């Protein structure tokens, strides 16, 4: 199928279709399990001339399996370019380090994944890169935080773990007026639910370990971009100047697993979105539950924004019980659902953000992020929604 025709397909078809392998005509992609590739005179000359992406050199620089994953990510994100990385945090680190230098400033949402927050709030200050944390759901707060040296505005499409949804269009306008690059972490939504590049975002980062892979068996990340504001070869510059130097390429077998995951992304997310909505409605009416955060609920503060930006509301939700001890008792007594880290897979997983993912974030900062000690995060899987509801009911009955 020609690229122009494939571009007109609906999302489900784009995700499921992979062109056959040129050499074998296999409809499934091969795995190139090699760290080294043989040169000849022509390949040597291409390398000398700087045409490094068109040839295979060394596994840390790239691999044909990795390139196949990058091409498929471009298709489902609506991107002009993609760079695969070893993890979602590698995607975030590589994209930021590729854009920033000493003396630069970042405006970041105050509710972001804990490792992102810690990296910007602590590690980057060692290199004279400052960050101001604000509520990106409030465009005025973002605008007020800008400085002459602000190079990046960073936010999550659906915030981890509070499920906050920022309006993208005002952030795009602010970034363009200021000359800053707008980066969106789209992990909680996935490209099935939201494609931020279509809304004008400059760079999208994904933890492909989550919904994209979808089976809790592979770690990987992706940086996707449009070329209307950034140079066409921007990600290739980052590949060679940053990613290769940090040593964070995507492994070939993980690339193959993630390619397989993309093919079922649409059908998995359809079920996960439906189950999350059913579970959110049920928990909102439960007497032991203080509050539920899910963009599909009318009670969600940004419900109207979510309706505008997303055809469905994702497979993630959060709810709150009275105390951390109560939260632990609920999760420790779940039978069908897993009490485990990570998200976006075929099994429903749960965690207590305050004492797990955000454990290293000081309590005062967690309160500013609206992360309560009794907050429970749920990533819905492919189980029947009625069975999920029954499992939470029996666990909640014990507190």
Region locations from a protein language model:
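Conserved C-terminal alpha-helix-loop-beta "cap" of PLP-dependent enzymes
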Residues: 289-376, 380
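Conserved PLP-enzyme active-site core in the AAT-like
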Residues: 2-6, 12-20, 82-288, 293, ...
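Conserved N-terminal alpha-helix of the aminotransferase class I/II PLP-enzyme fold
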Residues: 39-90, 115-122
């Amino acid at each position: 199928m020609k690229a122009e025709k494939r571009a007109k397909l609906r999302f489900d078809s784009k995700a499921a279709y992979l062109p056959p392998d040129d050499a074998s005509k296999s409809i499934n992609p091969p795995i190139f399990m090699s760290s080294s590739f043989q040169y000849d005179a022509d390949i040597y000359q291409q390398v000398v001339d700087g045409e490094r992406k068109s040839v295979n050199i060394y596994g840390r620089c790239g691999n044909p399996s990795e390139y196949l994953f990058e091409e498929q990510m471009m298709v489902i994100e609506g991107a002009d370019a993609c760079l695969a990385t070893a993890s979602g945090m590698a995607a975030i680190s590589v994209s930021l380090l590729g854009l920033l230098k000493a003396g630069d400033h970042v405006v970041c949402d105050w509710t972001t994944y804990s490792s992102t927050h810690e990296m910007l709030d602590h590690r980057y200050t060692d290199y004279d890169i400052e960050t101001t944390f604000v509520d990106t759901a409030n465009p005025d707060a973002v605008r007020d935080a800008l400085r002459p040296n602000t190079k990046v505005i960073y936010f999550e499409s659906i915030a981890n773990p509070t499920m906050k949804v920022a309006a993208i269009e005002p952030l795009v306008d602010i970034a363009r007026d200021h000359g800053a690059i707008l980066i969106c972490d789209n992990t909680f939504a996935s490209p099935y639910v939201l494609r931020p590049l279509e809304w004008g975002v400059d760079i999208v980062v994904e933890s492909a370990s989550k919904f994209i892979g979808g089976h809790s068996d592979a770690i990987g990340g992706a940086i996707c971009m449009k070329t209307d504001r950034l140079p066409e070869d921007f990600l290739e510059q980052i590949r060679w100047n940053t990613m290769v130097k940090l040593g964070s390429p995507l492994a070939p077998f993980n690339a193959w697993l993630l390619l397989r995951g993309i093919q079922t992304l649409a059908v998995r997310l359809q079920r996960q979105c439906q189950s999350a909505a059913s579970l959110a409605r049920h928990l909102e009416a439960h007497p032991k539950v203080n509050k539920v955060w899910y963009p599909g609920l009318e009670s969600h503060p940004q419900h109207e924004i979510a309706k505008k930006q997303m055809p469905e509301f994702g497979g993630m939700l959060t709810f709150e019980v009275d105390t951390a001890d109560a939260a632990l008792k609920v999760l420790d007594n779940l039978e069908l659902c897993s009490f485990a880290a990570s998200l976006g897979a075929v099994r429903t997983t749960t965690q207590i953000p305050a004492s797990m993912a955000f454990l290293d974030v000081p309590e005062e900062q967690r309160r500013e992020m609206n992360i309560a000690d009794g907050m429970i995060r749920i990533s819905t899987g492919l189980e029947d929604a009625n069975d999920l509801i029954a499992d939470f009911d029996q666990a909640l009955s014990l507190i």
